[in-house]
Amino acid sequence: MRKIGAVVKNMELQCGDYKKHNQLTSINYTRTDSDDGYQLTDEQILCVESAVQGHDLKIKAFAGSGKTSTLVEIAKKLSGRGLYLAYNKSIQLDAVKKFPVHVDCKTAHSIAYAANAYRIKGRVRNLNVFDIIECIEIERIYAYEENDVAFLTLKLLRIFANSDRQKIDKYFSTSLVFDTVEGNNFKETKAIINYVINRASKYWEQCTEEGSILPIEHDFYLKIYQLSQPDLTATYDFILFDECQDANPVLLDILLKQTCQKIYVGDEHQQIYSWRGSVNAFAKLEGAEYYLSQSFRFGEKISELASVIIHSKGEKKPLRGTANINTEIVQNCMERPFTVLCRTNARIIEKILRFPENRLHVVGGVVEILNLAKSGFALFTDDISNVKHLKLKQFKSWNAMLHFNHKYQDPDITLLAKIIKEHGVSFKNIIYKIENANYVEERLADIIFSTIHKSKGREWNNVVLEDDFIIFCNNQEIEEILLNYIEELNLIYVAVTRAKGNLLLTKGVKVFIERLVSYKKQKPLKIEFKESFRTIDGASYECARA
């Protein structure tokens, strides 16, 4: 493999003038220590100084760069009442312990719920197709049964709830919701789509009218809140928005209409939820741009590797590791406990089978993985009534799933189909083994499994990155990947930056990183690997593609 230090050095040379906002009036803020006693970096000081002068900020905070602590320092220096918007409940609860008392720490959903509690109390739950059929009139249309129509209607309602649109109309006719819809001809297909749009619009109308008792989901009341044109500026003097790279259009619409000072923090290279409606907020937001590029999570070898990934996307600022943190890129073997990060749930199914005698933990639980395995097998055996997983429930047959995947190449479906095809009807034995593996709490596990999506915000000492990426299998040109698969690169970046100590790259990942280093004809140098580890029981971790 080529060395990547030269790539990082080149990025530094290209980014020499990034401190374009550093000519600020002195505010007697020294560079010694924060209020909590830790040393602030020059980048953190610039952010605090600019915020105190009242500027709207866009802070690009790389992985492990202390974004939350920077926001806390900003909050301590700002006067008036502030709002810290957290991405989820766990982040919000942690933030309450860190931010000063003049800053409210909330999620967008908690604000929206409080504003609408009187009209939605007792109605909020996860909906299913039977709720839709029970609450509004749903009829069969051509080959699409009531359940099929209700399923598409619910998907469209969810897409609308995350959008910035004012109503459900023909704008959504090209939505991903309808990718699998096929009539016998164009006229039938159009009629099916229009009928689903009509039914979704009807449900939304009825569930939002005064006195309605129809059930709604959590994202629905956030949408109701957005449509009410809320004025947060009446309550708050400044807003701190964390993890803004994963904001969806409905939340962005709320924030962009506020006139108070706004400080956005996030890492656009960690945007991995576009399939859920999130957009790259940095492209839509206004404000003075700053970087937090010094990571306090890992050392220089992992930061150099991560810099190669973001540089290939056009990022000119390198991610810098902390020199006195010892992190290594290893090969072949890994100390236990270690965490295996996978692109897909299907790869986790494969890997669980490789370690039958070990204490295992699956981040987020094993239920979703079992649901995927059971639903895939039910589809394979034409047991359609037992297809429960949302990703597979839309298909009427195994062949319909394969036809869809030939066009759209979903990573989970691709690998799941491969595994089931290999095992055939004996795949039911695989399901049994997954159900009866030795699962324990994370702190007791020898091996931890997680999808990269679920690893977001986490960190572990020893990390193995699996190579179950569609972009590896299809061997696309780098230019095509940068054009069509940018989020896959983001996932790789998220994964490699979860490691605090040792990182093991499986075969496909190593080959791909070599291609990235060669991209744009970077100077060919070599990554140095540390002597391979052995696991506690002497077993090696298989790096080859499964």
Regions found by a protein language model. Give the residues of each.
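ATP-hydrolysis module of ASCE/P-loop NTPase motor domains
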Residues: 120-203, 207, 386-407
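Conserved P-loop NTPase-based nucleic-acid remodeling module centered on helicase motor cores
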Residues: 89-161, 356, 362-371
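Conserved helicase NTPase catalytic core signature
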Residues: 163-231, 416-442
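Conserved helicase NTPase motor core
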Residues: 32-33, 39-48, 56, 194-279, ...
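C-terminal accessory regions
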Residues: 417-450, 456-462, 467-533, 538
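Conserved helicase/translocase motor-coupling segment
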Residues: 332-448, 452
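Conserved helicase motor core of SF1/SF2 NTP-dependent helicases
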Residues: 60-69, 77, 87-91, 109, ...
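P-loop NTPase Walker
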Residues: 24-123, 307, 497
